Amino acid sequence: MLPVPSTDFEHMFELAPVSLWLEDYSAVRRLFEQWRAAGVVDVVPHLRRHPECVRAYGASIRLLRVNRRTLELFAAPDQATLEASLDQVFRGDMFESAIAEIAQLWDGVPEYANQTVNYALDGRRLDVRIRGRILPGYEGCWSRVLVSLEDVTERVQARLRLERSEKYARGLFEHSPVSLWVEDFSAV
């Protein structure tokens, strides 16, 4: 098998059809060590009692690099703009999903998966499926974590529309002031 030139890997990262983030979680690892030294055993209830710890987790992640698809998805002209606007990207309805992500890492799992909400810089809500992986060789320090984001907004919105439609039809059927019944004439 021929060795793959490093430029090929650069192109694969940059041109991947999914959003890719290369991040440094070494400060997260140190934060976890502090929490453990303070006596935290079960991280989920601890985080619910201390939401500032979730914010500390987020602030501990250092962004190293993103690819083009990330910039397109988040409507950012460049990485510096995206990085300066992360408080707009990660906000509000992320609390519970962040706890799930933290719990997976806390348990020593080198990979995590999660579904959450982010926001593009133009204000659009993005439902995203996140997968993170501590890269091989960095398990001891967590200084290289590859995170992918899949935009599942259309799927989530379609499911919500279907649920609303079903609820409307069920309500119409159950609360109609006249008799309604359904017949199947497909066999006729």
Residue ranges of predicted features:
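PAS/LOV and related PAS-like sensory modules
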Residues: 2-52, 56, 160-188
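PAS-family sensory domains
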Residues: 21, 64, 96, 101, 112, 114-126, 129-133, ...
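PAS/PAC or PAS-like capping segment
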Residues: 26, 135, 152-153
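PAS/PAS-like sensory domain cap-loop motif
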Residues: 70-81
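Terminal output helix/cap of sensory domains in signal transduction proteins
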Residues: 80-82, 86-117
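Short loop/turn elements at sensory-signaling interfaces that couple input to output
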Residues: 121-125, 129-145
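Sensory coupling linkers of modular signal transduction proteins
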Residues: 139-140, 145-170
